[in-house]
């Protein structure tokens, strides 16, 4: 069971299956009737919760995918290979193994496009492995799809007693890459070349792609 999330209300755990890992939390301030209703809704829809990567159904490509829309006159980007300390190499390979196991990336022998990974500090002694798409972002036109205005969202909550939020499990990785653009996401490590089959973090327009898909999916309940 994960540590209780940090929120204002005191919390009580709700188990959605026989597994001790399938736990969410509800406010301890709910009445018994409210808690019973909430439990019923959660159990009725427990199939929409993802606890591991294998629980993620992913978006069907015809519904949405991430296109890079590279400027036609652009030449393939190939960054100079970076070298890392052996300790960092182990961290990188561990992350690559996780991505391979999850089906997010695929190994390839040769690709025209290639960038490097970077290892940055995260929460003290931990490290985060990222792909450096800085150069690639220069050859993509900006996607100007409008993001929601925070002030309008706040105004729309007036006089509503209950608010609903969605926390998508590895949300970007649930969106597939447009297949002809997959090789342009390639990155190199000590053990080879890999490319993303799903939308990675770090690209300039991923936020717009994600918001466009959310607007499409929830169109019937927005507004």
What do these predicted regions represent?
Residues 6, 13-223:
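Retroelement reverse transcriptase polymerase core
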């Amino acid at each position: 069971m994960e540590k209780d999330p940090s929120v204002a209300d005191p919390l009580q755990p709700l188990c959605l299956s026989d597994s001790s890992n399938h736990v969410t939390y509800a406010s301890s301030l709910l009445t018994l009737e409210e808690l019973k209703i909430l439990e019923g809704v959660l159990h009725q829809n427990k199939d929409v919760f993802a606890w591991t990567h294998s629980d993620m159904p992913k978006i069907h490509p015809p519904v949405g995918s991430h296109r890079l829309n590279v400027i036609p006159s652009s030449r393939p980007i190939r960054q100079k290979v970076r070298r890392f300390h052996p300790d960092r190499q182990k961290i990188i390979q561990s992350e690559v193994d996780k991505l391979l196991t999850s089906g997010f990336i695929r190994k390839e022998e040769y690709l025209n496009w290639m960038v490097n990974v970077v290892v940055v500090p995260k929460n003290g002694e931990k490290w985060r492995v990222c792909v450096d798409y800085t150069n690639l972002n220069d050859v993509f036109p900006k996607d100007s799809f409008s993001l929601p205005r925070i002030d309008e969202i706040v105004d729309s909550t007036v006089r509503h007693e209950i608010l609903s939020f969605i926390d998508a499990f590895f949300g970007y990785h649930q969106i597939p890459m447009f297949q002809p653009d997959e090789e342009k996401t390639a990155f190199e490590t000590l053990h080879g070349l890999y490319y993303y089959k799903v939308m990675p973090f770090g690209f300039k327009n991923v936020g717009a792609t994600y918001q466009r898909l959310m607007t499409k999916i929830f169109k019937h309940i927005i507004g």
